Amino acid sequence: MFAQLDTKTVYSFMDSLIDLNHYFERAKQFGYHTIGIMDKDNLYGAYHFIKGCQKNGLQPVLGLEVEILYQERQVLLNLIAQNTQGYHQLLKISTAKMSGKLHMDYLCQHLEGIAVIIPSKGWSDTLVVPFDYYIGVDQYTDLSHMDSKRQLIPLRTVRYFAQDDMETLHMLHAIRDNLSLAETPVVESDQELTDCQQLTTFYQTHCPQALQNLEDLVSGIYYDFDTNLKLPHFNRDKSAKQELQELTEAGLKEKGLWKEPYQSRLLHELVIISDMGFDDYFLIVWDLLRFGRSKGYYMGMGRGSAAGSLVAYALNITGIDPVQHDLLFERFLNKERYSMPDIDIDLPDIYRSEFLRYVRNRYGSDHSAQIVTFSTFGPKQAIRDVFKRFGVPEYELTNLTKKIGFKDSLATVYEKSISFRQVINSRTEFQKAFAIAKRIEGNPRQTSIHAAGIVMSDDTLTNHIPLKSGDDMMITQYDAHAIEANGLLKMDFLGLRNLTFVQKMQEKVAKDYGCQIDIAAIDLEDPQTLALFAKGDTKGIFQFEQNGAINLLKRIKPQRFEEIVATTSLNRPGASDYTTNFIKRREGQEKIDLIDPVIAPILEPTYGIMLYQEQVMQIAQIYAGFTLGKADLLRRAMSKKNLQEMQKMEEDFIASAKHLGRAEETARGLFKRMEKFAGYGFNRSHAFAYSALAFQLAYFKAHYPAVFYDIMMNYSSSDYITDALESDFQVAQVTINSIPYTDKIEASKIYMGLKNIKGLPRDFAYWIIEQRPFNSVEDFLTRTPEKYQKKVFLEPLIKIGLFDCFEPNRKKILDNLDGLLVFVNELGSLFSDSSFSWVDAKDYSATEKYSLEQEIVGVGMSKHPLIDIAEKSTQTFTPISQLVKESEAVVLIQIDSIRIIRTKTSGQQMAFLSVNDTKKKLDVTLFPQEYAIYKDQLIEGEFYYLKGRIKERDHRLQMVCQQVQMAISQKYWLLVENHQFDSQISEILGAFPGTTPVVIHYQKNKETIALTKIQVHVTENLKEKLRPFVLKTVFR
């Protein structure tokens, strides 16, 4: 029977449409018993292909296509693994090929268990190679020209499932080669998957011996994987068990904990670790963290269930004492449930490459590697790549891909988006392109590297998996799942920017305050830090900076560290339903049901609410006498909702509880309660470890806020300016001679850096810093290299006031910029003693300056206009920070945004405003009656007094507005010659509606008219529009 050997899969990137799952399905439909894959150079899909075939009742045949230079000739070879030995040889051959190191001598040394096929298209009778081989023939091979001494074998290339796929493969080739469809060679025909019996009949008729050779070749093919654990030996000269015991005992003694119950807990854990064969694992993790600390890196408090291990704590793998905090080892490692321990190594994200180098050097470049991942065609990428080759312009592509949501597939967006569907259906070629895009969506496009994963092995990795070359170290060809399935150790090196933040804050405190802080040793009950959590002042704090967590903190108002840990756990679906109960019970406003005195100590810390998975385990241990290992199995069954297992466990739980003298009814009720909570109970060990890291960051924010904001603003892409301003920091005005490159905070002043100016070349910014001081605008421009003498680079510097120290009129500098550039480049060199003749100009208003600064660097740097208004105000108002719920108040604010809706009942319009007073933000509601009165006055960016009642909603204050009053009584004055352009002026003014009154003075007849029906929003654009029709404009 025919066997399909030469199948290219989607792992021959953009050269095939054969994905494995559909391959298995179609092969069975077409009557195949034996199928193969033969990707070019790589074995990316080999493991999943073999396991998939076995699962689907198909015989797998693993092949590899390589091209090798021999005697100045490129020879194309198809290599077939005939057995497990041949499989292992293919791993090595593919690794050599993917590392650029494959040559004929190496190949010949690794051909045991491998059959070689040379396709007839690449064969000639002059070819002489140092090994036996088959000649692969297809339906189009001229058999009369074949060497009669060579064995023939059927070999038909497959790249797609059906002839209809040829157009899609043609598109993939165009994308791969970055060509248009017209420039891309057409795809070879007759490479679709064909019925097995049809091909069997063909070869029986035309080349029966070739078919027999194929049957003989594949008849005994079978592959077996070694799935045994292959942990690297940490120290070949010493017992891992002995070394681990010595290190952990020394660690506890160093911490002053060599006493009971620590000694018995340590012995208990060491026995389990040794029995499960994981001594080397702990030593390797210890070694990696030791390396980080030896370099001065902050390695954090650990994460996950590993925080429940005393061994990990003694080795400083984690920073939480599991005995003191009642954390369970069995939640981490359970002898009754064999699985690899999983300790993720957190490290500062800026040092990850250092760890990769250490692993490579310490454990060997052939024993360690990074892990491959596959980038696929996402819906947006598929649309962009395909439609581009149909000649669709970029702006249309952008508009189309904007309609695709983050979680959308092409099928779902077509179904739910009317506008997307209309575009696709508007043209025949769009429908065709869309069909192709859907066909390639999800297919691998290229390889990438796992963000965290590293694989390590006791022996050479290529004995187990194929590799390829990488920049820092080798990269696996198998994905993470296939690696672990082969018994290899996968470790995750997780670069956490929060650890970078902590380390940089420690360094800055030491530099600025001369104070060395051991952040791992701070008091987790520090009052100032607890107060910060209680206020919800946690912007920038790991795990607690999202609005949901902030609002929860404001409700709970944690009074001790344990309640911060509880907040982490309550901030999850399901558990959050018990927040009110938690608060009321803590305040004594609701009865705490502890069920049975024997489990009261387990439930008391969380006021009778089962928040943690460990509580379920402890209850099973104390109430029903389960071992903690068995209790962990119960927890897993509950969390996975394994009904059959849970039913069995329930009967066991009740029987065991009754054996201890518990009442059956109580036991059954308790089990149901445990079952309910286990579905969303949180890992207490993980919650503790990450809450500790959050507390460390918050400690800096509470005690060293200037350090906190300085680091967060310079090492994070998030915007912390608003938060800093709400914490009484002020943005300082900087000059060309003082502005830093990165943001800087000194005392309570924020100095915005040049890096914030969008579009400013970094080299130009560095040049400014290196060349200063400058003593005038002319001096700066004279010394500026010609490549930077462009208005697009210079104007932002002027608009944000960097030259105010030389000339405070920014508009004047801008209006003279063209002349200045001519002067410094031409006239200045001719007449060195001459000076530039400045032309005067009316400067920007304070509001305009502030707006320009906001636009360019994201925040105003000069004095906020609202502060000027406040200083001159005769009206009483309350800062937003001092508002009290259920009180009447007047606030002086600027409107940031206006959102208008219609009420569901009456259909009337009402509005939601977001406003600020330069320090804090406030949400304001105008109901229909008030909105109808004031809607014409409300303009984003303008300043107002708002009067209303302060309410609390979702634990945030907001105002229900009753009155609106403009804060500025300025008018917009127009000086015009006569009435000639009245209609044009009226039309322009009408296009800029606002709240500023307009007064027109006619010069010819000395007439002054205040417009009663038109008020405007004064902008530079308005001035420009009016310029041809007026003599002068004044805003005053």
Swiss-Prot record:
UniProt keywords, alphabetically: Cytoplasm, DNA replication, DNA-directed DNA polymerase, Nucleotidyltransferase, Transferase
Stretches of the chain forming a coiled coil according to its record: none
GO molecular function ontology, one term from the record: nucleic acid binding
InterPro entries per record: DNA_pol3_alpha_NTPase_dom, DNA_pol3_alpha_thumb_dom, DNA_pol3_finger, DnaE2/DnaE/PolC, DNAPol_HHH, NA-bd_OB-fold, NA-bd_OB_tRNA, PHP_dom
Family per record: Belongs to the DNA polymerase type-C family. DnaE subfamily.
SMART domains: POLIIIAc
Intracellular or extracellular location(s): Cytoplasm
Cellular compartments per GO CC: cytoplasm
GO process terms (BP): DNA replication
Catalysed reactions, semicolon-separated: DNA(n) + a 2'-deoxyribonucleoside 5'-triphosphate = DNA(n+1) + diphosphate
Enzyme Commission code(s) on record: 2.7.7.7
Transferase found in the keyword field: yes
Protein name as catalogued: DNA polymerase III subunit alpha
Function: DNA polymerase III is a complex, multichain enzyme responsible for most of the replicative synthesis in bacteria. This DNA polymerase also exhibits 3' to 5' exonuclease activity. The alpha chain is the DNA polymerase.
Subunit comment: DNA polymerase III contains a core (composed of alpha, epsilon and theta chains) that associates with a tau subunit. This core dimerizes to form the PolIII' complex. PolIII' associates with the gamma complex (composed of gamma, delta, delta', psi and chi chains) and with the beta chain to form the complete DNA polymerase III complex.
Leading EC class: transferase
